[in-house]
């Protein structure tokens, strides 16, 4: 019996391309509508997102629109939680599609596993050609290092999960989302869950699809910001980064540093060429064995997507060191 009330929290901003399909997927959820509330927190969209949401909210009383005048995701999530009345919180993203049993499976596995945060693997799907290439990069070990939450068949405990679901009281007790974190807010929350003895569980029974950025320039901006705010996360918690998080930064420093030194030294020029050649061979190999793409031209574009992810994240990581390392970043106790 699904008698517990569930609040679905959805941050939105200029999502007119995706919002209608997303809202329809919410209407198709098999969780009883009398025990469901859907809170769409809008960052003052300038496209037709708000109009579309309002038209649905007028028809369906369990949907409501909340304004987020501060625009960014972490504020939206906390506003949603503060305006919620459910025993459970399920976070969703409008840039995605969800299976009909998504909410009910989240609640089922929260009960079954006694984990503090439960979700499914991040399955990335594209609509346009470029989106499909970028989606393939998410499943490429060379691009993201094979993170467990990007593996479609992974089930078990992990250090993070996209979106997630929680008991509301627990989420409030650990301080909800850190409003100083416009990026990496999920990682920060999951770190605090683990720090407080909680567990994070992923199961492929919880099914969804995420739509990635539509252009390489948007992908660059996204991963640059991830790199910047990863430093804030490291600084806040005093947690040493994984070796894999250093690799993009080392690659960028190598490209720029050895590239400049190659003008003054033949030895550095040869090392620079050798390094780029090795990177290109590895990128070529992992791109061309990727089964998500078929055509040679798409696999070549995948090489470019991998490169964009590496350079943008590495450059952001370096920028984050300059931005945060000498600043008085406050450490939270929650």
Per-range role (PLM):
Residues 1-28:
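N-proximal low-complexity "stem/linker" segments adjacent to membrane-targeting elements
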Residues 89:
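Short aromatic/hydrophobic "clamp" motif used to bind/position activated sugar donors
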Residues 100-132, 136, 207, 211:
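Conserved donor NDP-sugar-binding/catalytic core segment of glycosyltransferases
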Residues 110, 178-241:
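Catalytic donor/gating beta->alpha subdomain of glycosyltransferases that bind UDP-sugars
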Residues 250-327:
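Membrane-embedded multi-pass helical conduit in multi-pass membrane proteins
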């Amino acid at each position: 019996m699904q008698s517990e009330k569930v609040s679905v929290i959805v941050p939105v901003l200029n999502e007119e391309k995706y919002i209608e399909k997303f809202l329809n997927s919410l209407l198709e959820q098999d969780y009883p509508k009398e025990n469901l509330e859907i809170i769409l927190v809008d960052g003052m969209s300038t496209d037709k997102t708000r109009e579309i949401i309002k038209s649905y909210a007028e028809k369906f009383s369990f949907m409501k629109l909340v304004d987020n005048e501060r625009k960014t995701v972490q504020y939206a999530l906390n506003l949603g939680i503060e305006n919620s009345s459910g025993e459970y919180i399920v976070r969703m993203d409008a840039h995605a599609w969800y299976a009909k049993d998504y909410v009910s499976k989240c609640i089922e596995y929260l009960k079954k596993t006694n984990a503090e945060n439960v979700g499914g693997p991040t399955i990335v799907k594209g609509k346009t050609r470029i989106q499909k290439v970028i989606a393939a990069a998410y499943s490429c070990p060379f691009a993201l290092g094979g993170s467990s939450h990007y593996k479609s068949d992974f089930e078990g405990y992990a250090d993070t999960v996209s979106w997630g679901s929680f008991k509301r009281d627990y989420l409030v007790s650990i301080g909800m989302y850190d409003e100083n974190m416009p990026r990496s807010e999920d990682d920060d929350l999951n770190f605090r869950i683990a720090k407080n003895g909680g567990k994070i569980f992923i199961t492929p029974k919880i099914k969804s699809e995420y739509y990635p950025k539509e252009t390489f320039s948007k992908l660059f901006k996204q991963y640059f910001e991830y790199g910047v705010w990863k430093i804030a996360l490291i600084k806040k918690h005093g947690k040493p980064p994984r070796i894999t998080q250093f690799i993009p930064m080392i690659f960028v420093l190598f490209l720029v540093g050895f590239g400049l030194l190659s003008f003054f030294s033949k030895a550095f020029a040869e090392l620079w060429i050798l390094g780029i050649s090795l990177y290109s061979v590895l990128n070529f190999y992992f791109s061309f064995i990727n089964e998500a793409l078929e055509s040679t031209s798409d696999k070549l574009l995948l090489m470019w997507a991998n490169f964009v992810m590496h350079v943008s994240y590495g450059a952001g990581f370096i920028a984050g060191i300059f931005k945060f390392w000498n600043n008085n970043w406050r450490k939270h106790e929650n």
